[in-house]
Swiss-Prot record:
Annotated GO biological process: translation
Keywords tagged on the record: Ribonucleoprotein, Ribosomal protein, RNA-binding, rRNA-binding, tRNA-binding
Highest rank taxon of the organism: Bacteria
UniProt family annotation: Belongs to the universal ribosomal protein uS12 family.
Taxonomic source organism: Photorhabdus laumondii subsp. laumondii (strain DSM 15139 / CIP 105565 / TT01)
Protein's UniProt keywords contain Ribonucleoprotein: yes
Function description: With S4 and S5 plays an important role in translational accuracy. Interacts with and stabilizes bases of the 16S rRNA that are involved in tRNA selection in the A site and with the mRNA backbone. Located at the interface of the 30S and 50S subunits, it traverses the body of the 30S subunit contacting proteins on the other side and probably holding the rRNA structure together. The combined cluster of proteins S8, S12 and S17 appears to hold together the shoulder and platform of the 30S subunit.
GO MF terms, alphabetically ordered: rRNA binding; structural constituent of ribosome; tRNA binding
Subunit relationships: Part of the 30S ribosomal subunit. Contacts proteins S8 and S17. May interact with IF1 in the 30S initiation complex.
GO cellular component, one term: small ribosomal subunit
Membrane-spanning ranges: none
This protein's name: Small ribosomal subunit protein uS12
Amino acid sequence: MATINQLVRKPRSMKVAKSNVPALEACPQKRGVCTRVYTTTPKKPNSALRKVCRVRLTNGYEVSSYIGGEGHNLQEHSVILIRGGRVKDLPGVRYHTVRGALDCSGVKDRKQGRSKYGVKKPKA
């Protein structure tokens, strides 16, 4: 145990928290260009074809981003916005594509939970 005098001379150091989304560099979202759009299969015990794209960000990082929702219009050279948030059953995918922003369209015919998929309120 350190004495009071030792703690006055050299206080205890704080643990440095490691970020789960280093490519965002403490920003809420980042813009990037799709370099590859593809599907991949999840870890066991799940089974699907998950839509993913490889993105070159404005700060030079290249990351994988998940494309949520049913159907998308992304292809190579599409400009998209990414946010943090990993996909638990896809190793290495730590970012989500923001639907309805820049070149990424909202989900077609979405009626519920629209704000998460970039869909405007339908005309009554």
